[in-house]
């Protein structure tokens, strides 16, 4: 009986591993998905003061092909509307303020930003005894941005399937064609390109019948046009305005990240699971970032589950970031006032509630899930920060609803 109990515990941990981001096909390399899966998710993102709003629609379908292969296809549509920070300036008192793009009577939604992004991706996974190989690609398009990307992943199980090693690689080829507007002075024929490469090495280890640990190291290299064509930078001589230039960033960026994830199963709490994640990332632009996340997966009754979640994030500013610059632009090789490159911290908390219904007609199971998340972005939350960028603080909430059908 002890052997059977231990085996069941290992299976529960393997299922818990499948809940970790990026592990749905790699945590158990030899595991073939034997059912058809259809997924749909809707999300609504809204920033404070309704500055920016996004509606996200996602659909996915996966199906077995024979006894050793799975195919998948994913569709995404994002619809964005609102306003965005364009540049920073000094007011009459010398205080730095943020200029936000306003309403536009000529746009389809009456706001300065009306975007729609459509994306499609697909993949094939072939399962061996104790290994799997995955290859896929995708295409994403907006009116001013097009991306084509490819990816592959290899996974190997050994140590009686208690250890899994993952190798991953991806490449993206992007084309940027900024739309002529008040904040883009480039010629309408202007086009730029960007390429990205990502590599991953990871290990997933079942420690004992109640716990699992995953560790990933990833490397990335980006080259080409890495600036934001709709951002501007102001230069001052003291408090006197001296120059105004478009965002100019280095044409290369190298980055690496280390992610550690720990899962602990608690059978005494109705098979609950604790997930703890820590991620450190750094790049040669000078941005070091820390992310800590904790979530508790609690089955309740009759296949209901609740998942409260907490996340903390902190990053340093880029070497070439300033709210406004002193002197003239000729004195700087790169410059940006984009708040995303500033030093800041963020705290978010949320909860998800799901219900699974089994054996519905021809379907094996149907799972519904809804969730809400609140995010607060502030320079005061930065590790070692001084709150100097508090003019760009904001918050948002994200509401999601989804279903998964297995048949």
Where are these regions (language model features)?
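Short loop/turn motifs that connect adjacent beta-strands in outer-membrane beta-barrel proteins
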Residues: 26-34, 67-68, 130, 159-164, ...
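Short glycine/proline- and aromatic-enriched beta-strand/turn motifs that initiate or cap beta-hairpins
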Residues: 28-65, 72, 375-377, 398
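Membrane-embedded beta-strand positions of outer-membrane beta-barrel proteins
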Residues: 38-40, 73-75, 135, 165-169, ...
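Transmembrane beta-strands of outer-membrane beta-barrel pores
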Residues: 42-46, 77-81, 128-130, 139-143, ...
């Amino acid at each position: 009986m002890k052997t059977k109990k231990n085996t069941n515990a290992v299976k529960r941990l393997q299922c818990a591993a499948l809940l970790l981001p990026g592990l749905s096909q790699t945590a158990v390399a030899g595991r073939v998905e034997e059912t058809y899966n259809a997924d749909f998710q809707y999300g609504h993102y809204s920033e404070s003061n309704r500055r920016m709003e996004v509606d996200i629609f996602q659909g996915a379908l996966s199906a077995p092909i024979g006894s050793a292969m799975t195919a998948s296809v994913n569709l995404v549509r994002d619809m964005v509307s609102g306003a965005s920070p364009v540049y920073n300036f000094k007011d009459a008192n010398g205080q730095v303020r943020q200029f936000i793009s306003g309403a536009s009577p000529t746009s389809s939604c009456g706001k300065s930003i009306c975007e729609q992004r459509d994306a499609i991706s697909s993949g094939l996974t072939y399962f061996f005894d104790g290994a799997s190989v995955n290859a896929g690609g995708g295409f994403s398009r907006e009116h001013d941005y097009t991306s084509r990307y490819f990816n592959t992943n290899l996974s190997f199980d050994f140590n009686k399937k208690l250890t899994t090693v993952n190798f991953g690689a991806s490449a993206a080829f992007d084309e940027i064609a900024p739309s002529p507007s008040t904040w883009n002075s480039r010629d309408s024929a202007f086009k730029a390109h960007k390429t990205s490469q990502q590599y991953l090495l990871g290990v997933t280890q079942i420690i004992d019948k109640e716990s699992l640990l995953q560790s990933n190291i990833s490397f990335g290299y980006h080259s080409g046009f890495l600036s934001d064509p709709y951002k501007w930078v102001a230069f001052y001589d003291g408090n006197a305005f001296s120059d105004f230039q478009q965002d100019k960033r280095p044409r290369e960026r190298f980055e690496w990240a280390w992610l550690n994830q720990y899962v602990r199963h608690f059978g005494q709490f109705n098979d609950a699971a604790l997930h703890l994640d820590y991620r450190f990332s750094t790049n040669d632009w000078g941005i070091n970032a820390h992310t800590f996340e904790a979530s508790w997966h609690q089955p309740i009754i009759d296949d209901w589950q609740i998942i409260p979640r907490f996340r903390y994030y902190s990053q340093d500013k880029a070497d070439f970031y300033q709210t406004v610059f002193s002197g003239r632009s000729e004195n700087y090789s790169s410059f940006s006032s984009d708040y995303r490159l500033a030093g800041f911290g963020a705290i978010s908390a949320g909860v998800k509630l799901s219900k699974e219904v089994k054996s519905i007609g021809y379907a094996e199971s149907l799972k519904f899930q809804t969730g809400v998340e609140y995010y607060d972005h502030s320079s005061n939350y930065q590790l070692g920060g001084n709150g100097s960028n508090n003019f760009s603080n904001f918050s948002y909430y994200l509401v999601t609803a989804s279903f998964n059908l297995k048949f």
